[in-house]
Curated annotation (Swiss-Prot):
It comes from the Eukaryota. Mn(2+) 1 binds at residues 98-99. This is Probable protein phosphatase 2C 27. GO terms for biological process: signal transduction. Binds 2 magnesium or manganese ions per subunit. The keyword Heme does not apply. It is an enzyme of class 3 (hydrolase). It holds the Pfam family PP2C.
């Protein structure tokens, strides 16, 4: 597969990430995981704001001896697979696939999930239904088409983002994460599927599974993933449901001019960046050079500097041609002064601590 490059970064790109080992001490119970938010495909045309899509990416093997996982950037999903866009509505596609137990599952999902989505009869008018169905279908196809047992013993988390018009659809199965910058404020676009999530625990237990020492059935750190067909009691080919689910949670929003960029990262990134810290870090770098690929490289390098030893991947999508602006604070009777989002966040933390 190949796509056109956009500013040296918008292309079909392959890389790898891997699951970061997590100790039980890292698990804190969350109260809730968000449910799906729906939006009609046609709403993308309801405003004069037109996103200018740019993207960049970077992967690093980190402290590992091998790269298990993958990512993908496709500027025109339908055209990439020989299909025509509906009403000339271009759909771009981005994904990070964080593999474990080998690279086979991550590479299979990277290579096949976009195609399965495009070839669905309801694409693109019912994208939410299509994406949810395609995750599960790709998972089943991986089990059916693997010709050797080693491939079946691998698994992968998967997070994808699709942009069409002014709509952004994020689908997540696992613990990769997507964070949106809305005028310098971090907006969580996905929930980590780990055993610390209360809704995930309830789902697991309702399907006969259990959590042991922070692991699903004592075997897996994530509660949703594709692959892992070798693990007993978690799912069966052709059977609906199961403690380990390949069905993604979806979140869709309408983009506005306040929305600056989206960061997609493997879990190793988020173990060393909070959502807001990642947004602050990214805004500052983009204001310096406005180079998305370089910014992804800097995010990965900063995670390594902070102690990350896993494979790492960062993908960024910007919705504007220009860099994010400095935020301004009105001071009555005084001249406006610029202050960065990072500075505002630090000030807020300081004031809340008093």
């Amino acid at each position: 597969m190949c796509v056109e490059e956009l500013e040296g970064a918008e292309r079909l790109d392959f890389g790898g990430v891997a699951e970061l080992e997590t100790t039980p001490a890292d698990f804190e119970m969350e109260k809730v995981c968000e449910n799906t938010v729906s939006l009609d495909f046609k709403q993308a045309r309801s405003s004069s704001f037109v996103p200018v899509i740019r993207s960049g990416d970077w992967s690093d093997i980190g402290g590992r001896d091998y790269m298990e996982d993958a990512h993908v950037c496709i500027s025109d999903l339908a055209n990439n697979f020989g299909h025509n866009s509906v009403d000339d509505e271009i759909i771009s596609f981005y994904g990070v696939f964080d593999g474990h137990g080998g690279k086979d599952a991550a590479h299979y999902v990277r290579d096949n999930l976009p195609r399965v989505i495009v070839e669905d009869a309801d694409f693109p008018l019912e994208l939410e239904k299509v994406v949810r169905r395609s995750f599960v279908q790709t998972d089943s196809q991986f089990a059916e088409r693997c010709s050797h047992q080693n491939a079946l013993s691998s698994g992968t988390t998967a997070l994808t983002a699709m942009i069409f018009g002014r709509s952004l659809l994020v689908a997540n199965a696992g613990d990769c994460r997507a964070v949106l910058s809305r005028r310098g404020t971090a907006i969580e676009m996905s929930k980590d599927h780990r055993t610390c999530c209360l809704n995930e625990r309830k789902r697991i237990e309702s399907l006969g599974g259990y959590v042991d020492d922070g692991y699903l059935n004592g075997q897996l750190a994530v509660t949703r993933a594709l692959g892992d067909w070798h693990l007993e009691g978690l799912k069966e080919v052709g059977e609906p449901g199961g403690p380990l689910s390949a069905e993604p949670e979806l979140k869709m929003i309408t983009l506005t001019k306040e929305d600056e960029f989206l960061i997609i990262g493997s879990d190793g990134i988020w173990d060393f960046f909070s959502n807001q810290n990642a947004v602050d870090f990214t805004r500052k770098r983009l204001q310096e050079h406005n180079d998305l690929r370089l910014c992804c490289k800097q995010i990965v390098e900063e995670a390594i500097r902070r102690g990350a030893s896993d494979n790492l991947t960062a993908v960024m999508v910007s919705f504007h041609q220009e860099a994010p602006p400095q935020l301004r604070v009105n001071r009555t009777g005084r001249v406006e002064r610029s202050i960065s989002a990072e500075g505002l966040h630090s000030l807020r933390v300081l004031l809340e601590g008093q």
